């Protein structure tokens, strides 16, 4: 049974405020105008602030002489009633603007305004002016209440200070936390920039199934579901890889997909059960070209969205401009563990002794490749601050990657690490159907041995490879982690609009 967390109870004073607001809504219902829907907005606060930013040019007289009138709507964020005249501030998706309200101009609407609450959504029409303090203001000639807010917003000085409440009530967080809105605006721009970059290079965006008969494309535990009409168990996809490579077989030589993946794993500052990935495949490319592509798309996206390639992330200053370092996994392990020799890197017994010395817990089924990876993750990964490609992973931990022509037991694979976090994974794709079938069989044996993240045997994918897949390079970039990097966010929950949370009671 899912553990439930008690829902936070509003304080008594908040309950009384809600009751007061409900009474106001009741009065509006009595007038038959509770939630009007006949207002069409024509202007945005941010656009006006930008257009009339120069106070020396746009003096009060110049604004009045311009004859400019505006028609706006937004959430009431502040109000100051001073008798015959009042000030208010409204917020829309683009920013905020001040309203100057006069009783002798607005009449009954001004009287009604005095009873409105912060959080209400209002519409305003009027000309533009500038106050003595230089603030651009809308001199209202008409004012309406569009939506009555029943719940008070958090205190403006403290905002939504409870982090868990911010994630659960993202709708409130977005209202009161400008920094949160900016993160998600940047997220949208990042994805849009990456799409434009790929489209300009003849990549074709495609959509592949979210529900799979056989889970595959990554070593991960899947979520299961059931199709009632067909009486068929299905799996939410852990990766789109095998479907995308089927498309390469079919002649779509440059394809990509930006979409959700689902993995039935733990939750942390770096992991969410559902997450967004960019996955792409390019025929006639090796993992060297895919590393070049990875480096360039990340660098160009940063420049496009941020205007710089220098970012700060979780206490580290990252420079995306220089060429990213490329470092073999076994060499990185030996560099950080001088006790491990070159011969040890492929010697299972030797690696077992090193794991014991390093207090790394392992399973009896692990071969030398998995042991080498465990040592890398424990002793090297967290040290990789500046962008670094770790290359040439063991076959054992790379069931879909092409084997190296020169290094038996290794593959033409890379992972990109920045500030100790994996952002991308790619390789020259395995297109030998017999080798792929043998690796699937090894994964099945691992699953039978208790590895619930091991892959299933996908006979249809083997059949596709038997028609012939050209030499191909592939890449997966974690969009959520890339957004974390480019926005300086330290938790994946800060870049997901609605992160996974235990349900409230």
Curated annotation (Swiss-Prot):
Chain positions recorded as Mg(2+) 1 binding sites: 415, 422
CDD domains hit by this protein: LysRS_core, LysRS_N
Record: residues binding Mg(2+) 2: 422
EC number annotated for this UniProt entry: 6.1.1.6
Catalytic activity: tRNA(Lys) + L-lysine + ATP = L-lysyl-tRNA(Lys) + AMP + diphosphate
Compartmental location: Cytoplasm
Class of this enzyme: ligase
Alphabetized GO MF terms: ATP binding; lysine-tRNA ligase activity; magnesium ion binding; tRNA binding
Principal cellular location given in the protein's record: cytoplasm
InterPro entries named in the record: Aa-tRNA-synt_II, aa-tRNA-synth_II, aa-tRNA-synth_II/BPL/LPL, Lys-tRNA-ligase_II, Lys-tRNA-ligase_II_N, Lys-tRNA-synth_II_C, NA-bd_OB-fold, NA-bd_OB_tRNA
Biological processes annotated in GO: lysyl-tRNA aminoacylation
Keywords of this entry: Aminoacyl-tRNA synthetase, ATP-binding, Cytoplasm, Ligase, Magnesium, Metal-binding, Nucleotide-binding, Protein biosynthesis
GO CC, alphabetical: cytosol
Family: Belongs to the class-II aminoacyl-tRNA synthetase family.
One matching Pfam family: tRNA_anti-codon
Protein name: Lysine--tRNA ligase
Cofactor binding annotation: Binds 3 Mg(2+) ions per subunit.
Cofactor(s) the protein requires to work: Mg(2+)
Superkingdom in the source lineage: Bacteria
Subunit (UniProt): Homodimer.
């Amino acid at each position: 049974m899912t553990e439930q967390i008690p829902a936070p109870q509003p304080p008594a004073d908040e309950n009384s405020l809600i009751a007061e607001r409900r009474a106001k809504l009741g009065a509006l219902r009595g007038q038959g105008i509770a939630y009007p829907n006949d207002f069409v907005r024509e202007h945005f606060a941010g656009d006006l602030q930008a257009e009339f930013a120069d106070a020396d040019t746009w003096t009060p007289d110049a604004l009045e002489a311009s004859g400019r009138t505006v028609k706006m709507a937004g959430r009431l964020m502040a109000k100051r009633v001073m008798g015959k005249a009042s000030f208010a501030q409204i917020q829309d998706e683009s920013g905020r603007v001040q309203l100057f309200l006069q009783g002798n101009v607005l009449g009954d609407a001004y009287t009604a305004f005095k009873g409105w609450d912060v959080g209400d959504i209002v519409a305003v029409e009027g000309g533009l002016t500038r106050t003595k303090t230089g603030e651009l203001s809308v001199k209202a000639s008409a004012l309406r209440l569009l939506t009555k807010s029943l719940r008070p917003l958090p205190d403006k000085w403290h905002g939504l200070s409870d982090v868990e409440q911010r994630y659960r009530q993202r709708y409130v967080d977005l209202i009161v936390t400008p920094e949160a809105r900016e993160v998600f605006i940047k997220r949208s721009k990042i994805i849009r920039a990456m799409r434009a970059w790929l489209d300009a290079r003849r990549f074709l965006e495609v959509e592949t199934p979210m529900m799979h008969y056989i889970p595959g494309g990554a070593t991960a535990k899947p979520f299961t579901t059931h199709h009632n009409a067909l009486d068929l168990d299905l799996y939410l996809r852990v990766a789109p890889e095998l479907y995308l490579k089927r498309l390469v077989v079919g002649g779509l030589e440059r394809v990509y997909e930006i979409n959700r993946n689902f993995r039935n794993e733990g939750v942390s500052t770096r992991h969410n059960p559902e997450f967004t990935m960019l996955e792409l495949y390019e025929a006639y490319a090796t993992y060297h070209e895919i590393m070049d592509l990875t480096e360039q798309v990340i660098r160009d996206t940063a420049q496009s969205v941020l205007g710089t390639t220098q970012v700060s992330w979780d206490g580290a200053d990252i420079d995306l401009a220089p060429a990213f370092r490329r470092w073999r996994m076994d060499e990185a392990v030996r560099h950080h563990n001088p006790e491990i020799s070159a011969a040890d890197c492929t010697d299972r017994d030797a690696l077992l002794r090193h794991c014991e010395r390093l207090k790394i817990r392992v399973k009896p089924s692990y071969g030398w490749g998995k042991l080498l990876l465990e040592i890398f993750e424990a002793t090297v990964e967290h040290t990789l601050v500046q962008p670094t490609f770790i290359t040439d992973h063991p076959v054992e931990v790379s069931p879909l990657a092409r084997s190296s022509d020169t290094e038996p037991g290794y593959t033409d694979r890379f992972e990109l690490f920045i500030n100790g976090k994996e952002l991308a994974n790619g390789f020259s794709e395995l297109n030998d159907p017999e080798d792929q079938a043998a690796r699937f069989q090894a994964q099945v044996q691992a699953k039978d041995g208790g590895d619930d993240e091991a892959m299933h045997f996908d006979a249809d994918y083997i059949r596709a490879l038997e028609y012939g897949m050209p030499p191909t390079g592939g890449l997966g970039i974690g969009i959520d982690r890339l957004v974390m990097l480019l926005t300086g966010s330290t938790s994946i929950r800060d870049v997901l609009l609605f992160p996974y949370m235990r349900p409230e009671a």
